[in-house]
Design a protein with these regions (language model features):
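Conserved functional hotspot residues or short segments at active or partner-binding sites
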Residues: 1-109
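Flexible, low-complexity junctional segments that flank or bridge functional domains
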Residues: 109, 113, 117-127
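Generic, ordered loop/turn and secondary-structure boundary motif
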Residues: 89, 127-129
Length: 129
């Protein structure tokens, strides 16, 4: 993740963590994960982009483990015809970017920037500070 888009890691600190789930298929097994810290000196509200951070994590996982079943393929929120990731994101855009081995972070930036600017303008009248 650091190599492909270090700017997407700005505003937070990532730290390896280990945990032992108490239920489901990994119950009692030591698992590894990533903890996202946003409440210390590394936090920068203007720089932190959580959606991009998660997109980059998906992309890194797809790169390292191409055959890993990243996307849930069973009904989600009463949706029978769309994948959960597409429902959550409102389109196929994120999933298609992650699954495209040739796509780079700048591609996702260029696709999403217009919508982000429109959202910033639309919400600006409602911000109190």
């Amino acid at each position: 993740m650091h190599d492909s888009a270090p700017q997407w890691l700005a505003g937070c600190r990532l730290r390896e963590c280990w945990f032992e789930p108490t239920f489901h298929k990994y119950a009692g097994k030591l698992c590894a994960g990533v903890q996202i810290h946003v409440e210390d000196s590394a936090y920068d509200h203007a720089a932190f982009r959580p959606w991009r951070l998660q997109a980059l994590a998906f992309k890194a996982l797809r790169h390292q483990q191409p055959a890993y079943p990243l996307w849930r393929d069973f009904p989600y929120e009463y949706e029978l015809d769309r994948l959960a990731i597409d429902v959550i994101n409102g389109s196929t855009l994120l999933r298609e970017w992650v699954d495209d081995a040739q796509a780079i972070p700048e591609d996702l930036d260029s696709i999403t920037r217009a919508d982000e600017l429109a959202w910033e303008e639309e919400r600006s009248g409602f911000l109190l500070y």
